[in-house]
Amino acid sequence: MARLREFYKETVVPELVKQFGYKSVMEVPRIEKITLNMGVGEAVADKKVMEHAVSDLEKIAGQKPVVTVARKSIAGFKIRDNYPVGCKVTLRRDQMFEFLDRLITIALPRVRDFRGVSGKSFDGRGNYNMGVREQIIFPEIEYDKIDALRGLNITITTTAKTDEEAKALLSLFKFPFKG
């Protein structure tokens, strides 16, 4: 069992019940899934770029990503219908907790000039979005073997009803919020 999953059951759930006064432990918010998305606009000119992006995301997530394609042609961006424009991967259960553990304890502290993540990136429904500018903050990526620095978007989907509950949940997981 993942270290953070045990931590959630033993520490986070009782603390949230005490903080918000839930009547049942089933009401306590939990992390449902983590989605990693990498938009690769350069893939229009060079198909190899997409292969590198997919392999980077696979190393980071430990799971093969799905290539996302353009839904319609846009002449201004030089993309056609069904052109590959990015890749994404959805993590659930143990893989999700393992990734969150690596993100909080290893990757985020490796960000240059890191002062914490914004506490305002909640969507109003208890989900959290954050961007990572460089994929090299993850220890799985070797600096010498990458072709370009690529960022990715990380979405943490929770069952929380409000942003306040979601922030309390992530804070108890020792998520490094600013201030």
From Swiss-Prot:
Keywords: Ribonucleoprotein, Ribosomal protein, RNA-binding, rRNA-binding, tRNA-binding. GO terms for molecular function: RNA binding; rRNA binding; structural constituent of ribosome; tRNA binding. GO terms for cellular component: cytosolic large ribosomal subunit. Gene3D superfamilies: 3.30.1440.10. It comes from Neisseria meningitidis serogroup B (strain ATCC BAA-335 / MC58). Part of the 50S ribosomal subunit; part of the 5S rRNA/L5/L18/L25 subcomplex. Contacts the 5S rRNA and the P site tRNA. Forms a bridge to the 30S subunit in the 70S ribosome. Belongs to the universal ribosomal protein uL5 family. SUPFAM superfamilies: RL5-like. It comes from the Bacteria. The keyword RNA-binding applies. One of its GO terms (biological process) is translation. This is one of the proteins that bind and probably mediate the attachment of the 5S RNA into the large ribosomal subunit, where it forms part of the central protuberance. In the 70S ribosome it contacts protein S13 of the 30S subunit (bridge B1b), connecting the 2 subunits; this bridge is implicated in subunit movement. Contacts the P site tRNA; the 5S rRNA and some of its associated proteins might help stabilize positioning of ribosome-bound tRNAs. InterPro entries: Ribosomal_uL5, Ribosomal_uL5_bac-type, Ribosomal_uL5_C, Ribosomal_uL5_CS, Ribosomal_uL5_dom_sf, Ribosomal_uL5_N. This is Large ribosomal subunit protein uL5.
